[in-house]
Regions:
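Structural preference for beta-rich elements and adjacent junctions enriched in aromatics
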Residues: 1-223
Length: 223
């Protein structure tokens, strides 16, 4: 997906998000675990497509075992028909998180989750814009993510949807700079795509070409 948004500066290295540490907790999809109260929402501005009036925001925490993410997406129509993991979820409503722990390596982790709670976790080697996603091997036990979603409705009318997920450090093996400790910095970006009226995109940091423009990712600093 490409973006053009006049007036929005591109300053990814100066965009530092502090990530607070937490104890591990249960993923439910509601985002109501008390641990989420430790941190504030960060907004994802709409970056492409027709104006929607929808808001998108996210939270992130880390523990001794992995990374926790929470997205809240206002919406009026859920566009999601794919009913299995590892499909092209980005062709329907989806949220995405990209983590690039070591800038010296053109290798990062991408995670996608649909409103129907189907996932796409992949490792991505990216050589000067040539990239392809690779599925995890032995994806079971302690290497598996935990994820859940929730669609909020008023009667039959959709109001929003929430995505909550946990990515274990063991799944990120053998990426360098993992697990993070206090003071560790990773590059990262967070996105949403919605298909109510064509495709609309939201991004934490504005990229030049597509979601895989890792040189334009923002910075996470673990607290």
């Amino acid at each position: 997906m490409s973006y053009t948004q006049p007036g929005r500066d591109i300053n990814p290295r100066d965009s530092v998000l502090k990530v607070r540490k937490t104890v591990d907790f249960v993923i439910t999809g509601s985002g109501k675990a008390p641990q989420w109260n430790q941190t504030q929402w960060s907004n994802l501005p709409q970056a492409g497509g027709k104006p929607t009036g929808y808001s998108t925001r996210f939270k992130i925490l880390y523990s001794d075992t992995g990374i926790y993410c929470l997205f809240n997406c206002s919406d009026r129509k859920i566009t999601a028909t794919r009913n299995a993991d590892f499909l092209d979820l980005y062709n329907e409503d989806v949220v995405e998180a990209f983590f690039h722990p070591d800038e010296s390596q053109p290798l990062y982790f991408e995670y996608e989750l649909s409103p129907l709670n189907y996932e796409l976790p992949i490792m991505v080697p990216n050589f000067k814009g040539r990239f392809y996603g690779w599925r995890p091997w032995n994806y079971e036990g302690a290497r598996k993510t935990r994820h859940a979603t929730y669609i909020e409705k008023d009667g039959t009318a959709v109001l929003s949807w929430t995505a909550e997920f946990f990515i274990p450090y063991s799944l990120l093996t053998p990426l360098p700079n993992v697990p993070p400790v206090k003071g560790t910095r990773w590059r990262a970006n967070f996105y949403r795509i919605d298909y109510d009226n064509g495709d609309a995109e939201w991004s934490w940091q504005l990229t030049r070409t597509n979601f895989h423009d890792y040189e334009r990712f923002g910075t996470l600093e673990f607290d």
